[in-house]
Amino acid sequence: MERMLELLQGHVDYIILGILTLMSIILMWKIIERILFYKQLNVTSYETIQELEIDLTRNLTTISTIGANAPYVGLLGTVLGILLTFYHLGHSGGEIDAASIMVHLSLALKATAAGILVAIPAMMFYSGFNRKVEENKLKWQAIEVRKAKQ
């Protein structure tokens, strides 16, 4: 356990923030793809609502998964940061410096903040895209009703 903590000591921030950065890049890629898709969408080109729904909801699971899990990745970074703070405190030889502890704890919390920073826009876009899915399905159904009446 001690060897693992020493190994993590200088790398926790890079690992956690690297994972969150990767999640952010994937998130932006999926968001941009969805925006471009919804802009060019023509619901009349679909024969069934199931085909439409498949295309409308593509990549939404990824966006939702990132939004739901980014805070946990950040929380993992915070827990590891606090664990390392206590590890250093235990190996300090009884010399407790409150200022140093506070600095380490505040730095540990940045991982949670970063996770939340990734999650909030992800969930906002996910909700907005879900509304677009419903609107486009309703448009398709309205067109089908008009066709049936003719």
UniProtKB/Swiss-Prot annotation:
GO terms for cellular component: plasma membrane. Its main location: membrane. It is a multi-pass membrane protein. It is found in: Cell inner membrane. Pfam families: MotA_ExbB. The chain crosses the membrane at residues 12-32, 66-86, 105-125. Keywords: Cell inner membrane, Cell membrane, Membrane, Protein transport, Transmembrane, Transmembrane helix, Transport. InterPro entries: ExbB/TolQ_transport, MotA_ExbB_proton_chnl, TonB_ExbB_2. One of its GO terms (biological process) is transmembrane transport. It comes from the Bacteria. The accessory proteins ExbB and ExbD seem to form a complex with TonB. Belongs to the ExbB/TolQ family. Involved in the TonB-dependent energy-dependent transport of various receptor-bound substrates. Protects ExbD from proteolytic degradation and functionally stabilizes TonB. This is Biopolymer transport protein ExbB. It comes from Haemophilus ducreyi (strain 35000HP / ATCC 700724).
